[in-house]
């Protein structure tokens, strides 16, 4: 008897300790104490299990919870009211509907807590209809639902009609006075994009706490309504409430999205005044806001005020600089991050690799990749996608393919990255093979980015049959209407010389942007249809859209290709005079080319001297070619001297100089040009061209001697056919 009493007392002691730990939320210690209890060969009783099951639910320890349930059954405690309730809550937490329902149905007595747990289980699983059926059954059995019951039902609501029904339910049962219920409804109205209904509910609430105000402010932040946020901030002050971290965070998010720098600065002042400027999350939000507003110096100043920078603030800074196109500065910040000893996040790695891709720096990108591998960082799919893109942009497709093939999980971005890589490097065959593999091996749907990459490759290769095939895929896949795809189709057909199809695709675009107009104009101009190009430019002006640099470049290029000197000069003059568009280097080069093609060499050189603030060796090369073709030796001599002073770094320019000196019989200068080119280690790549016939692309190089017999035979055949054609006519 003494021993039994001692055991009971010991069990009571452990139960008391376990319940105390559970009430204070120390669930890990609950399980640890239970282990000690078993080690002392003490058996748990009905008072032990509820706390254990609660701990398993809180710590996400399902397997341990299942073993506890087994012990409950072995000990014959399954009919205990509190244990069965805890089991329902455990299974509800893990969404195990069948297990929870089985325990629920076996219960002899059920109160509002059991019903609420079961209702929440169905609602969180998205089965709101069954949850409502349980509410009706609960009411039929005479048990009145409580506010927590409604909160559990709201946890799975995704549709506005369901929310409106539960709102009526809340009014009927008087839960519209419960602030927790009303805050939950406010949040759901905002998530369902019914911010107006949320505002009506907010105004009707008799009581509001900080959660109510922040929910409403976050709702307006999600739709970018800064004016309503300001009104709420003023009302808060009138109610004697001060904004907290969440209030400022939501407001800063909108300021950044709307690029409202003035509002962002005002919020920054308020954050400092209220003493929240020490909050790490708000400092990160300030960095994001300033970067989105294009104020990188201000973002640097905020970053410098953070004593212990975490990986989040470093990553925000790096990715923000990348969005601004400041790749070099992003790499500097990355270097500072490494020196600080901060851990790397996958997002930071992806942003840095993207910076290397933007700079076209293979060495730097490979170094970052090597650093990541040496330090054992695990790369997620977005980071691996960035590496694929970086290596592809740097021309190392073999490395891109290795990374792609070793990926455990590939998303649509992965496939787009590798396909785009091969397409941009004009390896259309491999790009198409990967495209077919994607359709065969995955359930990924063809999207606009995949198609645009392939169409761009077709444009570069002049592969019209393949382009038509991709056009068919676009139609079958229901990708259109999409401005990116439509514009890419116009570009592909234009560059392949199929202007009728380009025009049809252009006409089918419901909303034509400046890029699509520019592509069509350039297409007609390039293929000798300058008059039609100018007609389309006139249509563009009548459409009400304002021409920009893209349009003027397309029009000037068309005039240059078609010898339309007066029209080109007139349009160039109208750029600044009529439209306020300042010409850039490309526009000026077009005018020089226009004058050179019209054999107005002196005018071209005069225009160059008057309009180019910095010397341009490429434009001088255009004039030099025209001089040699038209025998303008005086201008040619001056240009040669100018080009020598610029010390060209391209072999082609030295070759041009050598030919020009030879034409002027300046043999010493010819020798000097070739010697200078050799001393710099420059080599002139041979000229080449390629032709695509019957789906096969063949490349021809200058002085190419392979298959010479076949080439000579074909030339003889063509010569005979031309002679025969001439005699017949």
Swiss-Prot record:
Keywords: Repeat
A Pfam family assignment: PPR
The PPR repeat ranges on this chain: 10-44, 45-79, 80-110, 111-145, 178-208, 209-243, 244-278, 279-309, 310-344, 345-379, 380-414, 415-445, 447-481, 482-512, 513-547, 548-583, 584-618
Coiled coil regions, renumbered to chain: none
Region span, Type E motif: 619-694
InterPro entries per the UniProt record, alphabetical: E_motif, Pentatricopeptide_rpt, PPR_At4g14850-like_plant, TPR-like_helical_dom_sf
Domain of life per record: Eukaryota
Transmembrane segments: none
PANTHER family according to UniProt: OS05G0305300 PROTEIN, OS07G0578800 PROTEIN-RELATED
Protein name: Pentatricopeptide repeat-containing protein At4g04370
Biological source species: Arabidopsis thaliana (Mouse-ear cress)
Gene: PCMP-E99
